[in-house]
Curated annotation (Swiss-Prot):
Principal location listed in the UniProt entry: membrane
Segments traversing the membrane: 12-34, 51-71, 125-145, 183-203, 207-227, 261-281, 301-321, 339-359, 376-396
Pfam families on file: UPF0182
Disulfide linkage: none
Protein name: UPF0182 protein Ava_3693
An example Gene Ontology CC term for this record: extracellular region
């Protein structure tokens, strides 16, 4: 008795704990979404998730539990003597009033005894049947459990996206092969099968309960598909196979596949569980014989088999549309074999499946104990399975090998064209403006001076050496860290670059655009000394980062160190950041430089407490601050403190004496986690970047000028005929720009591509969540840029899908690749790079993202892709193709020429032998008018205590290469009129001893 009471109390305690934990999570989420202004978004998600979970769990539990309960009533009693079954055949008629009676099996045992017409199963058939069905039950449990686990713990699945594979007749073998190849899952399946054979009643019901929760979890996490289904936006484009609008594949088909996944698993397990209940009744395995299915058992199984066959037919109906994702053939999507052979087979299997399903259901409703057509059911199912195997798998393979492959181009040509066209649509490649670029080689000093803005913004500093230098010169304390540096452009007063060379033929402009590297100085609490890592320090004192550095990309200061427009923390001036000139101070807002939200800000903190927050170091002392921003949730001294202590599992919050009524907790301060929590249906760029600008009045708050901008994407893997990338995505748009206030934590979503149907659907679902891009403050809008991740995906697809001729595509004769470059001493692919320059035929400079291409397995340039980022031209792509009959040097060829030059290679070797290391930076290919200029910086760093310095700049043009101390000197050496063009390589002016 004592142990029973202990067990009951423990159950009550665990239940209360789970209830409190769930309540705290719900309450904290409500308060947090209220803080960021997206409570309605959260409540709609919560309601839809809750409804889906209840429906899935309820329907599954009722169906499985109800059928298992009915099977318990209809099964043979354990006391039945099977040896007495073989008697004279007797008619068995049992009324429906007894069919549902709990005492059915006992009341009708004598009749069952007399059912001599039943066909018994001997042990040689009974044992394999029960083992196979038990293994299938285990396979179902493991398969759907893996899917649910991948949703619940994304890290469980290496791709973070569970692959939904429904149980279909043609995929069961493949699923079994995959699962059985893993020892853990194999052991689990075998263990489940053995448990079912020994304790069938308990484990079959237990699995039913588990599957109910599993299906609830799967539907719970697929709430987005349901909401999209009810608010679709047409693409106004149809697929070439079925003529359906693309929106059917993006919004409708995923929901039908989700329903198939759920109902197929539910009906299949229900049929298996009920069959096992009957087969294992009457102690059949011990007696070595099963008397056969009674008429009412048959009626029950007919009904369940009818529902299962209905789902099989539905599955083949869906398989028809899934042919547009077929990998068979030379191109993605439905190929010749799929359209001519596989599609008719699926149509036939769908119709046959429906016919069998309706027949089984009709027999269930209008049951006759004896029927002359009963044997036709088994024959029909046998024929159906034969058609599935023979026609569904063997015939398409034979056609592919014997008919298609000998005449592949002729057969597949129209389908290749479909793949090309729809892949280009899905990745927005069809909007690329393709032009011819024929380098003239007539660049002069006058042309260089005319493109002065381009020259002044050639990037000599890469973010890697700059960050190394920042960490040495600008971190100040161990707990500060520069996690990243980002390229951007700012409009500065002309005085900001007084030392730059001036074109005498141009009047000085009142402002100029400068390309810069901006790096936030964030707080890294993990770098705080271990002895100081106390609860108060972590959550009350070390609360925020401070300021940023901003460096021009094209100049170096004394000793080759980077110059700074913005740097330091001027402790003598109330923590203001230092600027290089008054012009910079007037051009770049530097007030309120505190970073409470950032890329590595992953701790929760409490502000407005009795403890002062560390603000910034001031000499040998520290300055302190009290947060007065709009972020955070008030917890004070009341019940909210207990709620958040439970939510954060931080019990010291309950006992600290440092809280005040106005105390607030700031959590989810990592900008990517913050926006992911608000909009999990979007994909976000891997590189948030900091902007210093005045965001008022869109962002409330006083004197705050630091904002994070993150690009967000709408993606899909269901675009018909579109060849997916390496991540499985076959549709993507950069539809949203997200802005996060670095001080207040406010988040706003702006629609950057209103033509995208997916973002239009989400905007209809959450009408108050998104704003048009025109509502973004102009000061912030001037800093949006074409995102690197999006550009990388498009440029990768373009390597193949620039070929629009089907024969050229089939032969892959014009395949491109991204060239390699030498960075440091390692060869690596060229990364896209930002540049301020003017495009050919465009009379003004603009902020571009560039990437060169070379032919497959060759090193000469074949094309370069440019993405525009300024004003009305934002988002436009231009592709410049080089003439194939002329050699245009690629990055690898220029790198080889640099390293083969005896003077340059000798100097690099000399640096590498003096306790230092020479680093060859990014090689930039820069279009200027109708010519190409190649620029590569060379850095020098010590092997210990690395502090990279810019020591040389290499410039290549046509067949000339120069290495000099500065870019201006290198350009002068190449383009000065008095130098004759005879030498292939012009040597550097002087050999300068590297800094010691």
């Amino acid at each position: 008795m004592f142990w029973k009471w202990c067990f009951r109390l423990s159950i009550v305690f665990v239940g209360l704990w789970l209830l409190l934990d769930l309540s705290s999570r719900l309450g904290a989420e409500i308060f947090w979404f209220q803080e960021v202004g997206y409570l309605q978004v959260f409540l709609l998600r919560l309601a839809s998730r809750g409804a889906l979970w209840v429906v899935a769990v309820g329907v599954t539990a009722v169906y499985l539990w109800g059928n298992l309960t009915l099977a318990q009533r209809l099964k043979y009693p354990r006391s039945l003597k099977i040896a007495e079954v073989r008697r004279e055949e007797a008619e068995l008629s049992v009324g429906l009033k007894n069919f549902l009676s709990p005492q059915y099996s006992l009341l009708n045992a004598p009749k069952i005894h007399d059912a001599g017409h039943l066909k018994p199963f001997r042990l040689r058939w009974l044992l394999p049947l029960t083992v196979v069905f038990s293994l299938l039950a285990g396979l179902i449990l493991v398969h759907y459990g893996k899917i649910a686990l991948a949703y619940w713990y994304p890290a469980f699945n290496k791709n973070s996206l569970p692959i939904i594979t429904p149980f279909r007749l043609e995929t069961i073998w493949e699923l079994g092969r995959q699962v059985f190849s893993q020892v853990l899952y194999l052991g689990l399946i075998v263990g489940v099968a053995i448990a079912i054979l020994i304790y069938s009643q308990f484990f079959l019901r237990a699995i039913a309960v588990i599957l109910s929760v599993v299906f609830g979890t799967i539907l719970f996490h697929n709430w987005a598909k349901v909401l999209q289904y009810f608010s679709p936006t047409p693409f106004n484009s149809t697929d070439p196979l079925f003529g359906k609008d693309i929106s059917f594949y993006i919004f409708s088909l995923p929901l039908w596949e989700l329903l198939e996944l759920w109902l197929m698993g539910m009906f299949l397990y229900g049929f298996i569980a009920v069959t096992l209940t009957y087969l294992l009744s009457a102690d059949s395995l011990s007696q070595g014989i099963f008397p056969g299915f009674s008429p009412q058992q048959q009626r029950h199984l007919y009904g369940m088999a009818g529902l299962l066959m209905l789902m099989v037919a539905f599955s083949y109906w869906l398989s028809r549309y899934e042919l547009v994702y077929s990998p068979r053939g030379v191109s993605y999507g439905a190929s010749y074999t799929d359209v001519v052979v596989q599609l008719p087979i699926y149509n036939i299997l769908c119709v046959l499946g429906l016919a069998i399903a309706f027949y089984l259901l009709w027999r269930t409703i209008f049951w006759r104990a004896k029927s002359q057509y009963r044997q036709f059911v088994f024959y029909g199912l046998g024929v159906y399975l034969f058609v599935v195997v023979a026609a569904g798998s063997v015939l398409p393979t034979v056609v592919q090998y014997l008919i298609v492959q000998p005449n592949e181009l002729q057969r597949e040509q129209p389908y290749i064209q479909r793949t090309i066209a729809l892949t280009r649509q899905a990745f927005s490649l069809e909007t690329i403006d393709a032009r011819t670029f024929n380098p003239q080689g007539n660049l002069t000093t006058a042309a260089i001076q005319a493109n002065d803005l381009t020259i002044r913004n050639i990037r000599l500093w890469d973010k890697r050496p700059l960050l190394e230098t920042n960490r040495q010169l600008q971190q100040f304390r161990p707990y500060y860290r520069f996690p990243d540096a980002d390229i951007d452009r700012y409009t500065l007063e002309a005085e900001a670059a007084a030392n730059r060379p001036v074109n005498p033929n141009q009047l000085p402009a009142p402002t100029e655009r400068r390309q810069v590297l901006i790096a936030p100085r964030e707080l890294d609490y993990s770098a705080v000394p271990e002895q100081a890592q106390t609860w108060i320090n972590q959550h009350l004192i070390y609360t925020h980062g401070y300021g940023f550095t901003m460096s021009p990309v094209n100049t170096a200061g004394p000793g080759g160190l980077p110059e700074y427009f913005v740097k330091d923390i001027a402790g003598s001036n109330e923590g203001a950041l230092s600027t290089s000139s008054e012009a910079v101070r007037d051009s770049i807002p530097i007030g309120q430089p505190r970073l409470y939200y950032g890329e590595i800000t992953n701790t929760y903190v409490m502000t407005g407490t009795k403890v002062r927050e560390l603000d910034y170091p001031s000499g040998s002392d520290n300055a302190y601050n009290a947060y007065d921003g709009l972020g955070g949730v008030i917890i004070g001294n009341g019940w909210r403190r207990g709620l958040f202590a439970m939510y954060l599992k931080d019990w010291q919050m309950l006992f600290t004496q440092d809280f005040l009524p106005e105390t607030k907790v700031l959590f989810r301060r990592d900008v990517k986690q913050r926006i992911q929590a608000i909009a999990p249906f979007l994909k976000f760029d891997s590189d948030p970047y900091l902007v210093a600008a005045d965001g008022s009045p869109a962002f409330p708050g006083q004197n705050n000028y630091l904002y994070w901008i993150v690009d967000a994407y709408t993606t899909s893997d269901r675009y018909p005929y579109s060849d997916p990338d390496n991540n499985g995505i076959n549709y993507i748009r950069n539809s949203v720009k997200v802005v996060i206030d670095a001080y207040n934590g406010s988040v706003k979503f702006y629609i950057a591509d209103a033509t995208d149907p997916i973002i239009a659907t989400w905007s209809a679902i959450f009408p108050q969540m998104f704003q048009p891009l025109s509502d973004m403050p102009v000061t912030l809008r001037s800093h949006i840029r074409y995102p690197l991740d999006y550009f990388g995906i498009q440029s990768e697809r373009l390597m193949t899908y620039h070929m629009t001729d089907t024969q050229v595509f089939y032969n892959r004769e014009d395949q491109w690749q991204i060239p390699n470059e030498i960075y440091g001493s390692e060869s690596r692919p060229v990364e896209p790079y930002y540049l301020i320059t003017s495009l050919p035929t465009v009379p003004f400079e603009e902020f571009l993202l560039l990437l060169p291409y070379t032919p497959k397995q060759r090193t000469n340039l074949i094309a370069w892709l440019a993405a525009r980022s300024d004003g009305e031209n934002y988002g436009k792509l231009l592709l410049y193709n080089f003439p194939k009959e002329r050699l245009v040097f690629g990055p690898e060829q220029i790198e080889a020429r640099i390293n083969q030059d005896p003077v340059i290679s000798q100097q690099i070797s000399l640096w590498n032998r003096q306790g230092s290391r020479a680093i060859q930076g990014n090689l930039l290919v820069i279009p200027i008018e109708q010519s190409l200029l190649y620029v590569e910086p060379i850095y020098l760093e010590a092997t210990q205590n690395s502090l990279p310095t810019l020591v040389r700049v290499v410039v290549a043009y046509e067949n000339r290469i120069v290495m000099a101390q500065t870019l201006e000197q290198a350009l002068q050496a190449i383009f000065q009129p008095e130098v004759t063009p005879a030498p292939a390589i012009i040597r550097p002016f002087e050999e300068v001893t590297p800094p010691g």
